[in-house]
């Protein structure tokens, strides 16, 4: 089962990632000003995962990735995959497990290596 992880970036914005059961990041959200925006997006994904579209693309390096979209808005961008088959497996993991995935909140953790 996958997991949503909310964390705080160094610039004080928030993001969330969806990780596979093995702990590998499948996608990362754009930066968000408020933590509740992350929570809202996660709940929307869990409630309506079938309504999202996955726009597949190829990076200049030749690796595959996708953008998770809803109504022409990018909700998240995937990690890079070496093959189209692995990309499909990543998308299927979201569709299969997002609904029952846990949400972990790491926003209160201090940075290990502050400036």
What are these regions (language model features)?
Residues 83-115:
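Terminal recognition/anchoring or ligand-binding modules at protein termini
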Residues 44-96:
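Short, solvent-exposed interaction modules
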Residues 25, 32-54, 93-104:
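A low-complexity, Ser/Thr/Gly/Pro-enriched, surface-exposed linker/loop concept
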Residues 23-34, 73-83:
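A short, exposed loop/beta-hairpin motif centered on an aromatic-Gly-Thr core
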Residues 3-26, 57-75:
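Short aromatic-glycine-(Arg/Gly/Cys) micro-motifs in beta-strand/loop hairpins
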Residues 27, 37, 59, 63-66, ...:
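Short, surface-exposed, charged/polar-biased interaction segments
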């Amino acid at each position: 089962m996958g997991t949503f992880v909310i964390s705080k970036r160094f610039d004080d914005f928030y993001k969330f990632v969806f990780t596979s059961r093995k702990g590998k990041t499948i996608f990362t959200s754009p930066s968000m000003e408020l933590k509740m925006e992350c929570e809202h997006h996660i709940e929307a994904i869990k409630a309506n995962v079938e309504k999202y579209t996955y726009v597949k693309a190829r990076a200049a390096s030749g690796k595959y990735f996708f953008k998770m979209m809803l109504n022409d808005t990018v909700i998240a961008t995937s990690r890079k995959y070496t093959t189209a088959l692995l990309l499909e497996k990543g998308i299927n993991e979201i569709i299969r497990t997002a609904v029952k995935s846990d949400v972990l909140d790491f926003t209160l953790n201090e940075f290990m290596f502050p400036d």
